Each structure stands twice: as structure tokens, then as C-alpha cells.
Amino acid sequence: MARVLKSVALVVLVLIVAIVGIVAFTFLGRMRPTDGREVGGARIVVDGFSSVAVVPLRDGQVALVDAGNDGTGAAILLELQRRNLDAGAVAAIFLTHGHPDHIGAVGQFPNAEILALADEVPLIEGAVGARGPLPRLFPVNPTGITVTRALRDGEVVTLSGVPFRVYAVPGHTAGSAAYLANGVLFVGDSADTARDGTLIGAPWIFSDSQDENRVSLVRLEQRLVADGADVIAIVPAHSAVMQGMGELSAFASANR
């Protein structure tokens, strides 16, 4: 029996080491985001290994793209303080998807409307679990978050004169979204910036379907071109800003 327990413990240890190694390799292969980077009027706030975008609106309000990893929202609140604002100034939070490192501080902003694609609402609210190889290992529990506005693909939400166009990019999760505002395309985890500056798709270990993610990015590029969108920058949640749409177009050309 002791020998069996030792063997099981060894297997578990090997699995843990392997998972940690894969996760570390995944993040080391990305170009890290820069805290305080400003693009298209938005400011990037790094929150641990994730990031949040603060988009200024009129009348002293802001919108957030995602809500970070830290449940206290410390990094976001510090940025608001820098602007002489408090938590009540957050009018809306656009969630790219429902993984924990993107919804952490939602509860810190009671005045905010919570927006996400309809297909992502069950994951955000904790009614279902994520299906990626690593996320599926975690238990499914209610998050205490209520999405107050379920969005449709292609919808435009205008806040204080700032339009946010919604693009469905399923693959990383079932209802992953990208948002285009002031020429900046916020893609969450659906794309990343590699060390060499090229655009790469969502990492397989965290994603429901890497193949679907790839198809979605190709379709996203086609739709942006068809819409005549003036994309000045692409902002992933876990990696550096990419200027213009060139890297997305290169990715799409290579994966059609």
C-alpha cells in the first residue's frame, strides 16, 4: 500500500511540475504589457499577470475593459485615484470573457453596468465551468456576478459619446469578445503578442478550442476590413500593445 501511495504521489508531483512548466513557458513566450501605457486615450493598468484597460468617458466617468485578477481592485482603484476619481466613477465594465483573472474586481464597482456577450454569461456568473485543459480542473461555483447587459455580436454600445463595437471571437471561451473603442481593439485572451512582436492566438492550455480561436481571429480581421475600421492598436490582456492592424492581418493571411 505504501508503495502504491508513493507511486500516486510521484505521478501527481510530475503532473504538477509539468503544468507549472507549461504555464511558465506560455507566459515567458509573450511580450509583457507595460503598466501605464496609453493608447487611443485608454490607459493600461497591469494587475499581476493580467491587465485592465481604463477608457475615459465624459463627465468624469470611465469604462473598464475587464476587471483584473485582484478581488480588491487595488491597481484599478489606484489608477482612479490618480485621476481624482473613486469606484463610483466606473460606469461600465466590458468583460472579454469569464476566466477569474478578468472578473476579479467586478464587485468593487457597484455603479457599473456589467456587459458581456450573451454566450459568455453562464461562465461569468458561475453557472458553468470553463472547458480548457487547465481551467476545467477547477470547481464550478457561483461568482456572485450578474451580467446586467447581454450583448450581441456586432452590437455598438455608446457611452458618453464613445462607441464600443462588439465582436464575437469564440475559441478561448465560448463567448469571448473583442471590443473596438476609439480605434483600439481590446482582445482579452483571444490573441497575444509574442516576444518577436508578432500576433499569436490564445494558448491551448487555457482555451476551449485553439482551432476555433484561430478561425475567429481570421474572421475578425475580415470583418474589421469589411467595416472599414481604423484600428490604431490591438491590446491583449496578458501581453504588449501592437500598433495598427498589421500583425492581425499577417496572422489571418497565414491561417486562411
What are the language-model segments listed below?
Residues 2-61, 246-247:
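Zn-dependent metallo-beta-lactamase
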Residues 33-83, 178-193:
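Conserved beta-strand hairpin/beta-sheet module of binuclear metal-dependent hydrolase folds
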Residues 55, 66, 97, 114-117, ...:
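Divalent metal-coordination and catalytic microenvironments
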Residues 62, 93, 113, 185, ...:
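Hydrophobic "anchor" residues on beta-strands that sit immediately upstream
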Residues 71-74, 81-149:
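Active-site HxH/HxHxD metal-binding segment of metal-dependent hydrolases
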Residues 148-161, 166-168:
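Internal catalytic-core helix/loop-beta-alpha segment
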Residues 163-168, 174-246:
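Metallo-beta-lactamase
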Residues 242-256:
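Binuclear metal-ion centers of metallo-dependent hydrolases, dominated by the metallo-beta-lactamase
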